[in-house]
Amino acid sequence: MPHLADLVASAKAAITSAQDVAALDNVRVEYLGKKGHLTLQMTTLRELPPEERPAAGAVINEAKEQVQQALNARKNELESAALNARLAAETIDVSLPGRRVENGGLHPVTRTIDRIESFFGELGFTVATGPEIEDDYHNFDALNIPGHHPARADHDTFWFDATRLLRTQTSGVQIRTMKNQQPPIRIIAPGRVYRNDYDQTHTPMFHQMEGLIVDKNISFTNLKGTLHDFLRNFFEEDLQIRFRPSYFPFTEPSAEVDVMGKNGKWLEVLGCGMVHPNVLRNVGIDPEVYSGFAFGMGMERLTMLRYGVTDLRAFFENDLRFLKQFK
């Protein structure tokens, strides 16, 4: 089939001349498509005697295979050339600075907790923790809070049943520590607490830090000196501070501590007092031998005062525009 050799030679020449994959595909269709030159050669077999058809078909298939191999080889060449051209056009300048990695930062409330733990750690306080699901004994009874106290009401406390609740303060940590450890005791107890309240200055969950010292000859003067030093260290100012008489069931005497704000108004920052003798008796400590003081403060409130934040809820909304200000 001399005409077949001419078709193969013509196909190979066209393949070599193709300058891109699209042109090469046109050659493939022209010679190997359904109506391609080589494909149509198969229709000529019917004109041959039956005994010659197998040999002639094999020759045609061999010709088609040669063209297909030439197509594959040329396609690889064209694709490789196109890739090299694209890589050359997209040369990376390795001297350019890379994409900047965004640095993370501590949440402002976490910053406050770390700062307070660092200060009291230098005074010999250790960090103590306890369960967030409490029983009414550790959350109320042991702290000299009677059954008729309003803090036990459903509208203030999240109750699971008649005796279990989400703790409303970290004071239960103090009770457990005093029951399991003999004086001298010097701890701070940070953690999440829960109260049924939600507005611009209250959230159902917030962070609290309580402190406790129990030892011989602990006085209110020790309490005042400790908190004076703490507040001036925390706010990094020589603040005007006042202790205002107050009432807490678990301390006697009790006080609330205010600092003078930049607007000339007093701002409440924490509550404190001398540990009530009944609380000491409840944990097996003799109030005739030992005394102590305790204090408690909201981490969000201190953070708001330190950074000038006006809405407590911003701490819980995870708005990066807000949080990035505290890096």
Curated annotation (Swiss-Prot):
<dbReference type="InterPro" id="IPR004529">
    <property type="entry name" value="Phe-tRNA-synth_IIc_asu"/>
</dbReference>
<keyword id="KW-0030">Aminoacyl-tRNA synthetase</keyword>
<dbReference type="GO" id="GO:0000287">
    <property type="term" value="F:magnesium ion binding"/>
</dbReference>
<keyword id="KW-0436">Ligase</keyword>
<dbReference type="InterPro" id="IPR010978">
    <property type="entry name" value="tRNA-bd_arm"/>
</dbReference>
<keyword id="KW-0648">Protein biosynthesis</keyword>
<dbReference type="InterPro" id="IPR006195">
    <property type="entry name" value="aa-tRNA-synth_II"/>
</dbReference>
<dbReference type="GO" id="GO:0006432">
    <property type="term" value="P:phenylalanyl-tRNA aminoacylation"/>
</dbReference>
<keyword id="KW-0547">Nucleotide-binding</keyword>
<comment type="subunit">
    <text>Tetramer of two alpha and two beta subunits.</text>
</comment>
<keyword id="KW-0479">Metal-binding</keyword>
<keyword id="KW-0067">ATP-binding</keyword>
<dbReference type="Pfam" id="PF02912">
    <property type="entry name" value="Phe_tRNA-synt_N"/>
</dbReference>
<dbReference type="InterPro" id="IPR004188">
    <property type="entry name" value="Phe-tRNA_ligase_II_N"/>
</dbReference>
<dbReference type="GO" id="GO:0004826">
    <property type="term" value="F:phenylalanine-tRNA ligase activity"/>
</dbReference>
<dbReference type="InterPro" id="IPR002319">
    <property type="entry name" value="Phenylalanyl-tRNA_Synthase"/>
</dbReference>
<dbReference type="GO" id="GO:0005524">
    <property type="term" value="F:ATP binding"/>
</dbReference>
<keyword id="KW-0460">Magnesium</keyword>
<protein>
    <recommendedName>
        <fullName>Phenylalanine--tRNA ligase alpha subunit</fullName>
        <ecNumber>6.1.1.20</ecNumber>
    </recommendedName>
</protein>
<dbReference type="InterPro" id="IPR022911">
    <property type="entry name" value="Phe_tRNA_ligase_alpha1_bac"/>
</dbReference>
<dbReference type="Pfam" id="PF01409">
    <property type="entry name" value="tRNA-synt_2d"/>
</dbReference>
<dbReference type="InterPro" id="IPR045864">
    <property type="entry name" value="aa-tRNA-synth_II/BPL/LPL"/>
</dbReference>
<dbReference type="GO" id="GO:0000049">
    <property type="term" value="F:tRNA binding"/>
</dbReference>
<comment type="similarity">
    <text>Belongs to the class-II aminoacyl-tRNA synthetase family. Phe-tRNA synthetase alpha subunit type 1 subfamily.</text>
</comment>
<feature type="binding site">
    <location>
        <position position="252"/>
    </location>
    <ligand>
        <name>Mg(2+)</name>
    </ligand>
</feature>
<keyword id="KW-0963">Cytoplasm</keyword>
<dbReference type="GO" id="GO:0005737">
    <property type="term" value="C:cytoplasm"/>
</dbReference>
